[in-house]
Each structure stands twice: as structure tokens, then as C-alpha cells.
């Protein structure tokens, strides 16, 4: 085989702990990695590594199906989803399955179907994983050259990258098709308090879509997390799907340019580090999205956002005290600022009190009361609808603050309900996962770069305690 790489640059492409580079085997002697190093033993065994990945996919899909059915079995239609600790059914409801006006669940059968489909898929994946891990060929290069690869083969690696991008693009278009043609998706902004609707007028203007990417991440700007209508979200998926598919075709048809060949380290561990870095960014972005965004993650299913619960509390007490005769336009609070209403730094009328820091919240139950200059005093006096009062009282008592033992809600709110919001769970878990994936990115990037430079020898294992212990088998 012709040499695909410069020996000087890529000698020891993989960092082996004991310096041997024998191909076969899954033991420490032949691979340089002990059993607990997992897939590192399979760096050069493409067939076995395929088995590990397919089995891993099976475990993921099995969890999704089993947890889905568990949530269906425990679901009480009379209670909101966010009070029941559900993290999967809200995603299905957001996609428009099983829900009607106001986010009310009218049919749980689609949720059951989703769980069963995932379980069946996981069985297929599990079988494939076991087959390739135990029975299939150790390496794919000889029998199935299309599926085989050498980590150093840059052209093959970018072809694999291209295939992945095309699959991601297809995934983005599946959401577009669901929103446009297959029943629509749940829109929390639909008049009267949310409903499932088909998206008709997609936002495809590049200045609007890519404008989100160029926005500041701070305050009311909020980067891509500030998206607040479904036309923009689905239109963004059209753009994203197109870019992924076109980029995938590009990477399949082309070879890496000279600058790319020089800039990147071309080894299995380097690709692992790139992937972990990307997933870390996904995790941090998802964390911010689920915490702040009530359009992609409707409050009817996930509970209110923190700012939303806070503004709901101010609104609820404004409604109460106005009924008791308070003049909410002029009442003064203990600090000399308005007790119920005040002005923002830019002059809009906003809720007063501690919730002033959340003045740029937008929520479907509040927007009808705004005028051209912030909250409209006339509407607040004459136009508040019962559904707005009910919803804000509900959100006030379900703030997404809570510890693991379910002591939830605002500490000073005597009506707060003991629960932990799915927003808390999803934001926290994605932040923690994003953080650890970032650490993994740094670790594997460091090892891959050192290996490429030729000075990473790994840990000296000659005197490691485990070597003097009885083998497990």
C-alpha cells in the first residue's frame, strides 16, 4: 500500500500505552490498552469497532423506548406534563403528537407507538451490535472495502464526514416535513393560548436566519436562543438541512486541500477529540435553549422559564391588588420605584419590583397586553382575560427552581409547588454533559497532538499494580 502520510509527522498516530502496534487481538499485550480502556482496543479493528458503535446506538434507542413507555404508563392527563417529571413526552407533544388547544393531551396512543417503535429499533440495533462485536469480520477493509477505512486516509475520512452530514441534513428536513405536511407542530403562540398548526410561511430570508447567529448572546439579544416564532425555527431547519446535505456532497466528492491536510491531525483519537468538541458546543447551546426559550420548548409542556415564572408572579399580584382597588399605574414600592409598573432603561413600561431584571421576557400569555411602548396601562385595566390570569398563577407557582429532593419553587413564594421542572433537569444535565465533553475534547486533543508530534509515550505500565494481580478470566 502506498504511504499516505509523512512518517516524520504521523509516526505513532495512535498513542499506545505499551508501544506495540499489532493488529489483531483485544488484550493488553496486542493492543496496548487494558479491557477497561474499552473501544481504544479496537482502534485498528474496524469490524469490531462497528459492533461497539451499533451496540451503543442500540442502548441509546432502548433507553428512549423504555423511558418513553415508562412515562406513558405513569402519565396522568389531568396534570401538566412538567409536574410529572416527564422529559420525553414533552418533546413528542412539542412535535404536535397527541395534543390539542392549550397543550391539552387528547390522545396518548402516539406516545405509546413512539415507545414501541424505539424498542423494536433497539432490538435490531442490539442484534447488529452483538453480531459485529462477536461474529462479524474483525476488519472490514478486505471483504467490504466501501465500509473499511484507515484512520490516516484523509480522503476516506472526509467521505465518512460527508455521509454523516447528509444524514444530519435529512434529519433536519424530517422536522420541516412534519411541520409543513404531516400534521404540523405545537405553536405556543397560536391565538387563545397555543395549538397544533401547520407552518405555512417559512422564513427563508438569509439575512433573518443568519442574523440570529450574528446577534449578541447577552440580554434581550440572546443569540439564536432568542428565536420566538416557529416560521423562523422551521425555516432555519430548511437552511441547516440544505447546508448539511450540500456540505456532505462536497466532502464526498472532494479531497482535503493542502492547508487542511497540514492544519489537522489525521488520527482516530484526533477525530474523537473533534467530535467531543462539537458535542460540547451542542450541549452548552441546548442548555441555554431549554432554559430560556419558550417557543422551541413550550411552557405548557416544560413548565415556565425562570424569567417567565418571575414575571407571572408580578402579573398575578398586579391583578389581585388592582381588584382590591390599588392604582397599579402610580403605586410606589419600598425603593421609591413603581411597585407594579416602572420604566425600563429604554423607556418601555415594564413590571416593577425584583422581576424588573427579566423585563425583556416574551411569553404568549403576556404579549397581548403590550402596546407600542411596553405594557399598556389601559389593557392592564380593562383587557386581562381569565386564561391569562389562570396561566400566570400556574406559572408563578411552578418556577424552574428546585433541588434534587424536589423542594421546588421560589423560596419566598408560599404557594410554590414541590416539584423539579423538566427545564431544570434538561438544562443542568446538558450543561454538565457539555462540560465533561469539553474536558474529554481537551484530553483527547492533547494526546492526539502529542502522538502526531511523536513525543507521547503514555504512562509507564511496567510496575503497575494490576499486572501482578490474578487475571479476571
Swiss-Prot record:
SUPFAM superfamilies: Photosystem II antenna protein-like. One of its GO terms (molecular function) is electron transporter, transferring electrons within the cyclic electron transport pathway of photosynthesis activity. Residues 1-14 form a propeptide. The modification Phosphothreonine is found at residue 15. Its main location: plastid. The chain crosses the membrane at residues 69-93, 134-155, 178-200, 255-275, 291-312, 447-471. It is found in: Plastid membrane. It is a multi-pass membrane protein. The modification N-acetylthreonine is found at residue 15. Keywords: Acetylation, Chlorophyll, Chromophore, Manganese, Membrane, Metal-binding, Phosphoprotein, Photosynthesis, Photosystem II, Plastid, Transmembrane, Transmembrane helix. One of its GO terms (cellular component) is plastid membrane. Binds multiple chlorophylls and provides some of the ligands for the Ca-4Mn-5O cluster of the oxygen-evolving complex. It may also provide a ligand for a Cl- that is required for oxygen evolution. PSII binds additional chlorophylls, carotenoids and specific lipids. One of its GO terms (biological process) is photosynthetic electron transport in photosystem II. The keyword Acetylation applies. [CaMn4O5] cluster binds at residue 367. PSII is composed of 1 copy each of membrane proteins PsbA, PsbB, PsbC, PsbD, PsbE, PsbF, PsbH, PsbI, PsbJ, PsbK, PsbL, PsbM, PsbT, PsbX, PsbY, PsbZ, Psb30/Ycf12, at least 3 peripheral proteins of the oxygen-evolving complex and a large number of cofactors. It forms dimeric complexes. One of the components of the core complex of photosystem II (PSII). It binds chlorophyll and helps catalyze the primary light-induced photochemical processes of PSII. PSII is a light-driven water:plastoquinone oxidoreductase, using light energy to abstract electrons from H(2)O, generating O(2) and a proton gradient subsequently used for ATP formation. Belongs to the PsbB/PsbC family. PsbC subfamily. This is Photosystem II CP43 reaction center protein.
Amino acid at each position: 500500500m502506498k504511504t499516505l502520510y509523512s512518517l516524520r509527522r504521523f509516526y505513532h498516530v495512535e498513542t499506545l500505552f505499551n508501544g506495540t502496534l499489532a493488529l489483531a487481538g483485544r488484550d493488553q499485550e496486542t493492543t496496548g490498552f487494558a479491557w477497561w480502556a474499552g473501544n481504544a482496543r479496537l482502534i485498528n479493528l474496524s469490524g469490531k469497532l462497528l459492533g461497539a458503535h451499533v451496540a451503543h446506538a442500540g442502548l441509546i434507542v432502548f433507553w428512549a423506548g423504555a423511558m418513553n413507555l415508562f412515562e406513558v404508563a405513569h402519565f396522568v392527563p389531568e396534570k401538566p406534563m412538567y409536574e410529572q417529571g416527564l422529559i420525553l413526552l414533552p418533546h413528542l407533544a412539542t412535535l404536535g403528537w397527541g395534543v390539542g388547544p392549550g397543550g391539552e393531551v387528547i390522545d396518548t396512543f402516539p406516545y405509546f407507538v413512539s415507545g414501541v417503535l424505539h424498542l423494536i429499533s433497539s432490538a435490531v440495533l442490539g442484534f447488529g451490535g452483538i453480531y459485529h462485536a462477536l461474529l462479524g469480520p474483525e476488519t472490514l477493509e478486505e471483504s467490504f472495502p466501501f465500509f473499511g477505512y484507515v484512520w490516516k486516509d484523509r480522503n476516506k475520512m472526509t467521505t465518512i464526514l460527508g455521509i454523516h452530514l447528509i444524514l444530519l441534513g435529512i434529519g433536519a428536513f424530517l422536522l420541516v416535513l412534519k411541520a409543513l405536511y404531516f400534521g404540523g407542530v405545537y405553536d405556543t403562540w397560536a391565538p387563545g393560548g397555543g395549538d397544533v398548526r401547520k407552518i405555512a410561511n417559512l422564513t427563508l430570508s438569509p439575512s433573518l436566519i443568519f442574523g440570529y447567529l450574528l446577534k449578541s448572546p447577552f440580554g434581550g439579544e440572546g443569540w439564536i436562543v432568542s428565536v420566538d416564532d416557529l416560521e423562523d425555527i422551521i425555516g432555519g431547519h430548511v437552511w441547516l438541512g440544505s447546508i448539511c446535505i450540500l456540505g456532505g456532497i462536497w466532502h464526498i466528492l472532494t479531497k482535503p486541500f493542502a492547508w487542511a491536510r497540514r492544519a489537522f491531525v489525521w488520527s482516530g483519537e484526533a477525530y474523537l477529540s473533534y467530535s467531543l468538541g462539537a458535542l460540547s458546543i451542542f450541549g452548552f447551546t441546548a442548555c441555554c435553549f431549554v432554559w430560556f426559550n419558550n417557543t422551541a420548548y413550550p411552557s405548557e409542556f416544560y413548565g415556565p422559564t425562570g424569567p417567565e415564572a418571575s414575571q407571572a408572579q408580578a402579573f398575578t399580584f398586579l391583578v389581585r391588588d388592582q381588584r382590591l382597588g390599588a392604582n397599579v399605574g402610580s403605586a410606589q414600592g419600598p425603593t421609591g420605584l413603581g411597585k407594579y409598573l416602572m420604566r425600563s432603561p429604554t423607556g418601555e413600561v415594564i413590571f416593577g419590583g425584583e422581576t424588573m431584571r427579566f423585563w425583556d421576557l416574551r411569553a404568549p400569555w403576556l404579549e397581548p397586553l403590550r402596546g407600542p411602548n411596553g405594557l399598556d396601562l389601559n389593557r392592564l385595566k380593562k383587557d386581562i382575560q381569565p386564561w391569562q390570569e389562570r396561566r400566570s398563577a400556574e406559572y408563578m407557582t411552578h418556577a424552574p427552581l428546585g433541588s434534587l429532593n424536589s423542594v421546588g419553587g421560589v423560596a419566598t413564594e408560599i404557594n410554590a409547588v414541590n416539584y423539579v421542572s423538566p427545564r431544570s433537569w434538561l438544562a443542568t444535565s446538558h450543561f454538565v454533559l457539555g462540560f465533561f465533553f469539553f474536558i474529554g475534547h481537551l484530553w483527547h486533543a492533547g494526546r492526539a497532538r502529542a502522538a502526531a508530534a511523536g513525543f507521547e509515550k503514555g504512562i509507564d505500565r511496567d510496575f503497575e499494580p494490576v499486572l501482578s494481580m490474578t487475571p479476571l478470566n
